[in-house]
Amino acid sequence: MKRQKRDKLTRAHSKGYQAGISGRSKDICPFQQNDARSEWLGGWREAVEDRHVGLSVK
């Protein structure tokens, strides 16, 4: 059975969240395309909010 590839925008959001929750800067966004960059930054913002609320991954 073939493993289905995840949507690139979903992956960008997930990677942004991972970067944000680990405390990295939003300036390290690896995406150049506006859609993917927007999703990455959205994930990053969500993670930063979660960190401020007290949720963290160690």
From Swiss-Prot:
InterPro entries: Ribosome_modulation_factor, RMF_sf
An individual GO BP term: regulation of translation
Region named Disordered: 1-25
GO CC annotations, alphabetized: cytoplasm
Biased composition (Basic residues): 1-14
Keywords of this entry: Cytoplasm, Translation regulation
Subcellular location(s) of the protein: Cytoplasm
Coiled-coil annotated spans: none
Pfam family membership, one: RMF
Gene3D superfamilies: ribosome modulation factor like domain
Function summary: During stationary phase, converts 70S ribosomes to an inactive dimeric form (100S ribosomes).
Entry protein name: Ribosome modulation factor
